[in-house]
Every structure is written in C-alpha cells, then in structure tokens.
C-alpha cells in the first residue's frame, strides 16, 4: 500500500441511494460490479427517523439488480426514534463473500418498518480496485474529485 496515492484515487463512489425519505418500501442502491473490487463498503446515513424498525442489507444480484438474495445485514434497529436519529450503519463486503451465490454484483437496500420513515442516504465505496486509479470507476453522478 502506497501512502503517496491520494484517498480519492484509492476509493471510488460506486453506488448510492440519494438522500430521500426512506419508509416501508425498500429502496435499493446502484448495482456494483464486484469484478472490479476486492472490497465494498456500504454506509447508510440516517436522519430524523420515525419510531420504526430499520433494516440495512447487502444483496448479491444480477447486473440489473434482479434475483437479489440477502448477502449480509446489519442487526435490525429497534423502533426508537431517539436512538436511531442521526446515526450510521456500515456493511463491508469482500469479493469472496459472493462465491456461494455465484453472482458478481452487489446492491444495498434500506427500509423501515412503517409508512413514516425518515430522511436517509446510502453511499457505497469501492475499496482495493483491481486496476488503479479506483476513481476511474466512480459513478457518473460524481461531479468532482479534488486530490
């Protein structure tokens, strides 16, 4: 690992759920091709949430997001608005985690147990790209990288 490579070249924004109200219909991130990465880090950022359960999961899937199967999940957050407000959930996925499913794509899902929900977003970062710089694989929606 070289300390001379900027973090913006070592990590890439490869998936997202843009800030929105998340409620009882699961919202999914952009699909990530794990053939380009050794690891993937999904970060859910919760805002002022209602007193409802919250589930954050990583799914193996096809390139179009179909045939999703739960791969990893955070422990369900209990329905407690004060405890869940302004918190983060993190899931780390390694390429080898997909071997049992035979899939090469991953997406993240976020859902609450009720209709009110609250504001949230998900950011998926590609880590340890097979080919550098990792930033070559950023989503098209990434407007700027300042190194």
Task: Please annotate each region the language model reported.
Residues 2-147:
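Surface-exposed, low-hydrophobicity beta-strand/loop segments enriched in small/polar/acidic residues
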């Amino acid at each position: 690992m070289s300390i001379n490579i900027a973090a913006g070249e070592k990590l890439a924004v490869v998936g997202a759920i843009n800030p929105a109200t998340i409620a009882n219909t699961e919202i999914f991130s952009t699909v990530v091709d794990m053939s380009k990465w050794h690891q993937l880090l999904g970060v859910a950022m919760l805002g002022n949430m209602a007193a409802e359960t919250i589930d954050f999961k990583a799914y193996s899937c096809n390139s179009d997001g179909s045939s999703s199967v739960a791969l990893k999940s955070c422990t369900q957050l209990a329905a407690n608005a004060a405890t869940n407000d302004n918190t983060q959930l993190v899931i780390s996925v390694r390429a080898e985690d997909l071997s049992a499913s035979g899939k090469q794509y991953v997406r993240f899902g976020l859902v609450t147990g009720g209709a009110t929900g609250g504001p949230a977003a998900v950011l998926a970062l590609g880590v340890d790209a097979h080919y550098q710089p990792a930033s070559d694989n950023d989503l098209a929606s990434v407007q700027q990288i300042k190194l």
